[in-house]
Amino acid sequence: MLHLIYISIIVVLIIILISYTRKPQYFRITAPRSVALFHGIHPLNPKNYKTFSEEFETILNNAIEDGDFKGQLTEPCSYALRGGKYIRPIILMEIVRACQLQHSFGAPIYPAEAALAVEYFHVASLIIDDMPSFDNDVKRRNKDTVWARFGVAKAQMSALALTMQGFQNICRQVDWIKENCPRFPDPNQLGALLCTFVSHSLNSAGSGQLVDTPEKTIPFFKIAFIMGWVLGTGTIEDIGAIERAAHCFGNAFQLADDIKDHDTDTGRNYAKIHGKRKTFDVVAQSLQECKKILHEKKIYTSIWNEIFQKVINVALGT
């Protein structure tokens, strides 16, 4: 009888050991969130621009309340992030959604952390762009710029905090995938790929900022498009095409802005050099090329009609 008990105990221990070794093992790169960023519409349900914008605003508010920014930088970072159009995070989230409609790895991926990252990077660049040593702007989004309200030193530190937190958000996105999507192929490789690509893109944006070219705008759309594609489990072989789509969209976005600022811009402005009509034609051609690629990769959805129209409206001044 005693032998049977010993044998039973050994069998149970073996089963526990096998179960443990078969369970996916991972370590967290980041501390877990104290609150969920969003509860609401299922990640794969279709959404219009307004719904996406409201969803991201909720994500942003929760992230700020959860302590994405610390101490004296909380107020200027929060101030800088309010009132945006959120077009870059919306693009990222929609590309992830569209990719997963074609193929998925178990639970749907919810890219809230990645969406925060791309917005943080973008807003950091706006803070720097407005500084006295660059454009010396005192107004943005119908309110004081960050440096004008909080001073140059806090503006510089806020831009740095936003950038650093953006990389933290990417790491948090990888951790989220590890915990919620066990069939996702090699999340650690994903994290390394995203951080390397983002670092390269931010370097390009910085170089573009120094010479005041579209290269200060396009890299942030490349981050949104390519992070969305990779997180949505799009193929690595197609990244070049997605990057081309992002370049076309970013170029159209910048040139539409040049048309809008034709009469007030004192820096380099394509519309002032080539005329509004020719510039508008390039905007339309760039959007058409972007649309063609998105169709080819089967990620063109109805919300893109709204996104493209917003760019056209900027160019038309409506």
Swiss-Prot record:
EC number: 2.5.1.-, 2.5.1.1, 2.5.1.29, 2.5.1.10
Catalytic activity: isopentenyl diphosphate + dimethylallyl diphosphate = (2E)-geranyl diphosphate + diphosphate; isopentenyl diphosphate + (2E)-geranyl diphosphate = (2E,6E)-farnesyl diphosphate + diphosphate; isopentenyl diphosphate + (2E,6E)-farnesyl diphosphate = (2E,6E,10E)-geranylgeranyl diphosphate + diphosphate; isopentenyl diphosphate + (2E,6E,10E)-geranylgeranyl diphosphate = (2E,6E,10E,14E)-geranylfarnesyl diphosphate + diphosphate
Gene Ontology MF terms in the entry: (2E,6E)-farnesyl diphosphate synthase activity; dimethylallyltranstransferase activity; geranylfarnesyl diphosphate synthase activity; geranylgeranyl diphosphate synthase activity; metal ion binding
UniProt-listed InterPro entries: Isoprenoid_synthase_dom_sf, Polyprenyl_synt
EC category name: transferase
Induction info: Expressed in the late phase of the viral replicative cycle.
Cofactor: how bound: Binds 2 Mg(2+) ions per subunit.
Main localization category: host cell
Keyword tRNA processing attributed: no
Binding site for isopentenyl diphosphate: K85, R88, H122, R141
Residues the entry annotates as binding Mg(2+) 1: D129, D135
Keywords noted in UniProt: Host endoplasmic reticulum, Host membrane, Isoprene biosynthesis, Late protein, Magnesium, Membrane, Metal-binding, Transferase, Transmembrane, Transmembrane helix
Cofactor list: Mg(2+)
Cellular localisation: Host endoplasmic reticulum; Host membrane
Membrane topology: Single-pass membrane protein
Residue positions binding Mg(2+) 2: D129, D135
Function: Trans-prenyltransferase that catalyzes the sequential condensation of isopentenyl diphosphate (IPP) with different allylic diphosphates, such as dimethylallyl diphosphate (DMAPP), geranyl diphosphate (GPP), farnesyl diphosphate (FPP) and geranylgeranyl diphosphate (GGPP), farnesyl diphosphate being the best allylic substrate.
Similarity field: Belongs to the FPP/GGPP synthase family. Asfivirus trans-prenyltransferase subfamily.
Protein name as catalogued: Trans-prenyltransferase
Native species: African swine fever virus (isolate Pig/Kenya/KEN-50/1950) (ASFV)
